[in-house]
Amino acid sequence: MTLLSSHLLVFSAVHHRAPPTTTTRNSPTTNHTVRFLCSPGVPPAVRLDQRLPRFVVPGAGAEDLLYNAGATVGVLGGGYALVRAFDELTRRNILQQGLSRKLVHILSGLLFLVSWPIFSNSPKARYFAAFVPLVNCLRLLVNGLSLASDEGLIKSVTREGDPLELLRGPLYYVLILILSALVFWRESPIGVISLAMMCAGDGIADIIGRRYGSMKIPYNEHKSLAGSMSMLVFGFLVSIGMLYYYSVLGHVQLDWASTLPRVAFISFVATLVESLPITKVVDDNISVPLATMAVAFFTFHH
């Protein structure tokens, strides 16, 4: 047999392999994603898109490492610029400190969520993304423990200007960002919805509640009906918007007919949890995203 005929036989064998067997249950694929298949007769709310994402970036080797490192630096720079911009607006009395702090709360997490598709398709990309809030976590620890003093950071993310505040709500906030990136990443709607409810839902609830919150919730005098309603509405809308964003980029495929009511239910539960008089025991930056994750996991996997 000649060398040419040997190559032709090998080529023929490769292109006539038997097709892979059909996945019959939730199982990991070779590209480290999971197919969400539903029980017979039950329409799926979400399927991972097995097509090549429309946003194609490097996936392996030194090029992938450099690409993700560059993306990390870019996202870090964007987050730093955001905080500094609001600090400057506050310093010039263009924005009140309380409003500036809440806008940072809303925008920093959402911009981090929007940045995920910038990273490569490598399974290791999530670790590069998680490095961004990890750096902010270290900044909060250093300043919260008074090992250093960044007045701009303290004014931008604390209520009273006390560095110890950095070790509570803001620290919990960045820890949830890290958790969502590492555990859920782009393969699941759970992390997307959780961050949308924590950042947009809870953040807008505070802004609206302080301005129009004269009518309080009967079981919690510190929370208002206007704030809770705004959290429900904006949390739902931002969650749907983010899911649509990831759907357009090809990371997930959604059955919108079943996804919309499920996200509405998740938003309702998250709003209910946020309205409970438990803030002194559990911070909203912990209770809201963790409750959202639990309900979303149950909703999208059943």
Curated annotation (Swiss-Prot):
Q: In what way does this protein cross or attach to the membrane?
A: Multi-pass membrane protein
According to its UniProt entry, the protein's GO biological process terms are: vitamin E biosynthetic process
The protein's Enzyme Commission number: 2.7.1.182
Reaction it catalyzes: phytol + CTP = phytyl phosphate + CDP + H(+)
Q: Per the UniProt record, which residue ranges are transmembrane?
A: 65-83, 103-123, 128-148, 164-184, 189-209, 232-252, 263-283
Q: Can you quote a single GO CC term?
A: chloroplast membrane
Look up the record and name the pathway of this protein: Cofactor biosynthesis; tocopherol biosynthesis
Question: What UniProt keywords are attached to this protein's entry?
Answer: Chloroplast, Kinase, Membrane, Plastid, Transferase, Transit peptide, Transmembrane, Transmembrane helix
Which GO molecular function terms does the record list? phytol kinase activity
| Range of residues in the leader sequence | none
Q: Which family does it belong to?
A: Belongs to the polyprenol kinase family.
Task: Report the function annotation for this chain.
Answer: Involved in the activation and reutilization of phytol from chlorophyll degradation in plant metabolism, including tocopherol biosynthesis. Catalyzes the conversion of phytol to phytol monophosphate (PMP).
Report what the protein is called: Probable phytol kinase 1, chloroplastic
